[in-house]
Amino acid sequence: MTLPLSLGPVRPVPLSAINPVAQLGAIAVVLPVLLVSGDLLTPLVVLAAEVCLLPAAGLTTPRTVLARTWPLLLGAAGVAWVNVLFGDAGWASGVALAVRVLALALPGVLLVASTDPVRLADALTLHWRVPTRFAFGTLAALRLVPLLAAEWQTIRLARRARGVEPGRNPVAQGRLFAGTAFALLVAAVRRGTRLAAAMDARGFDSGIARTNARGSVLRRRDAAYLAGAVAVCAAALALSVATGTWEPVFS
Amino acid sequence: MRLTGWGFRYPSRHAWAARDVDLRVDPGERVLLTGPSGAGKSTLLHALAGLLGPDEGEQTGEITVDGRAPAEARARTGVVFQDPDAQLVMTRAGDDVAFGLENAGVRPERIWPAVESVLAEVGFPYGRDRATAALSGGQKQRLVLAGALAPRPGLLLLDEPTAQLDPDGAVLVREAVARATGARDTTLLVVDHDAEAWLPLVDRVVELRPEGGAVEHGPGWRPAPLRLPVRTPRPAGAVLLRAEAAGYTHRGAEQPALAATDVAVPAGRTLAVTGPNGTGKSTLALLLAGLRPPTTGRIAAAPALTAGLRRPDRPPHRWRADELVRRIGTVFQHPEHQFLTGRVRDELALGPLRSGAGDDAAHRRAEELMERLGLAALAEANPFTLSGGQQRRLSVATALATDPAVLVLDEPTFGQDRDTWGELVALLAEQQRDGRALVLVTHDAAVVRALADDELALQPTPVPA
C-alpha cells in the first residue's frame, strides 16, 4: 500500500510548471463555490474539469490515480452511504454530497502529486510571507515521518522480545498500543530536539534575513491557471442556474 | 578558541557534566578530544557551538571562540553531529548544502557555485538533485559535512560523526574530513572515543577526565589496547536453532531484505553475522529471534529448545511471547527501544514475571543479575537516564533474566567506549561459558575476534541489470 502523500522530491510533471501558490489560489476559488452549492450539477462540472487535469499531474493510469486517491474515494463513498442510510433526502443527495467531497479534495491531490514540498515551502515563504521557521521547520519534520514508521516496527518487535504480547485480549491490545505509541513519542521528541539543534547550529532563524537559492517565480501561466479556475466555477454556476438546478445550501 | 577553568552542569543533575577544563586551540590546528563516556566531551562541543545558553544549565570559568562568546561566533562555526537523519533538512542533496548559506543571507547567485565546490571537496559522488533519502549513512554524513563547510567556517566541530555508521561509511567520512581540512584554513575539533581511527588526521590529542580536567597527550600516543577476554574454545554442542533457506522480503519490495540463508546455531558457540549494510544482518537476527516470520524457507528449533512448549511443532515466530523469552533472548541495537518500566529493578523482574515466575522468585533473579552485572547501585534509577554503557549492560541483563538458551544481539558494542566495550565482551564470554548459544550481528571486527567461533559473512545480493 502506497501512502497518498509523498515526502521526497517529486518527479516533475506538466502541472509542476504552475507555481504552488497559484494552485493554492485555485483551491481558494473553488472552495467557496463548492461549499455553497448543494446541487449535483455544479460540483459535477468542477469535478469534470479537475479530472481533466489528472494526466497533467502525472496520474495517467487508473492504478496511479487509485494509489493517490483511495482514502479520498473511500471517504466520499462513506459520506454518501451514511447520507443514504440516515438522511431523509435519499440517493440523489447522497451522490451529490459524494461528488462535492471529491471535487473539494481533488485539487489537493493535484497539488500534492505535482508539487515538490521544498518548492511549496519556497513559494509560501517568498510570495505569501509565511514565516521561514514554520515552513522549513515543517519540511524538516516531514522528513522524519518515514523514519518514525520504521521505529514503530522496531519498538513493537522489541516488546515481543521482552515477553510482552497482548494475545487476543482487546484491553491488553489497547494498553500495548498505548505503550508503543508513548515510546514512539519519546523517540520522536528526542529526534526532533536533535534536528532543531542541528538547524540552530546551521544558523537557521538567527535573525539574519534569509535568502532563497532556488527562488520562486510567478509567471503569466500562473495567472492563467487561476483565471481557468474562476472560469470553470463561473461556467458551473451559470449552467446550473440556467437549468434551474442550482440550490444554495443555506437557503 | 580558549577555555579556562570551564565547567558545566545540567539543571536536573547533581554532578558536573564537565569541570576544570583548560584548553587552548590555535587557528588551523586539528585536535581530537577523547575520553570515556560521560566525561563531558559532547557537552564541551555543544558549548563551543554556542548551543548551551544560560537556560540549559550552570556554567563556570570562561569559554571563547575567536575571542567572543561561542553564541556570538556561531556564524563562524560549523557542526556535524552523530545522526545524519537528524541533521538533513531538505529532500535534495544540493538544497541541503545550500540551507546554511541561505540562513547566512548569501546572495542566491553565489550559492550554487559554493555548493558545487564544497560537494566536490568532500567527494560527494552524486549530483545536486540526488534525493537525500536514497543515500547510504556514510554519504548522508558526507552531505552533512558539506553543509557545515559551505559557509566556510573558521572552526569545524565534529561530534562523533562516525558513531552511527558502518566501517565503510566511517571511512568515507574520515576521507572527506581529511580532504576538506587539508588546506588548514579551518580549525578542527573532533570528539570521538574511537581515538585510533582519527590519529592520522589530527595534530593533538586531548583527553577529558571524568573526574574533571583535561590531559594533553604527547606525540606518538596510542590508546590503551582493548581488553580481550580469555576464552577456552568448546566443542560445538547440540544445534538449537537452524535457518533453512530462510529469507525475507518486505511487503511491496522488489529486492529481498535477506536472501535465502542457511545457518546453524549450536549450544555453547558464538556465531558472528557480518557484512556490509543492507545485506540483511539485522533481518536474519529478527528471524532467528522468532520476532519475524521468514517469507521464504524456515527457521527450525531443535527439541532441546522446544521442550515444554505447548505446541512444539510451531516455528519460533508463532511461539507465545512468554514462551519465547525463556528460550531465545534478544538485545536490540538501541537499548531504549526495549525498556518498559521506570526502575532498573522492575525492568529486570519483568521478564521472569511475564514468563510465569512468582513475585519473590522474579525479584530474587533481578537482585542476582544486578549484583553480577554491577547494576546494584542503580536499582532504583530510571533505565532511560542511564549512560550508554549502563543501558547496554541492562538490556543484556533483561534478556538474561529469563535464562534463555539462545541470545541474539544486534550491534552490542555500538557506541561503547573502551571500558564499557571490555565489560560487555567479558559478560558475553561468560554467557558462552555457561553454555548459551550467542548470535552477534556486528560491524565491529574486534568483537568478532574476541568472541566468535563461527562467522557468517553476508554478501550483497547482486542487483539484476
PLM regions: where:
Chain B
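Catalytic Walker B motif of ABC-type/P-loop ATPase nucleotide-binding domains
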Residues: L156-E160, L407-E411
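Helix-to-loop junction immediately C-terminal to a conserved catalytic motif
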Residues: A49, A289
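ABC ATPase NBD Q-loop/coupling interface
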Residues: G50-L52, E62-A73, R298-E323
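Conserved ABC ATPase "signature" region
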Residues: E109-G127, D360-L378
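ABC ATPase C-loop
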Residues: A148-L149, A399-L400
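The feature captures the beta-strand-to-loop junction immediately N-terminal to the Walker
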Residues: T34-P36, T274-P276
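ABC-family nucleotide-binding domains
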Residues: D159, D166, D417
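Conserved ABC ATPase signature
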Residues: A131-L135, Q139, N382-L386, Q390
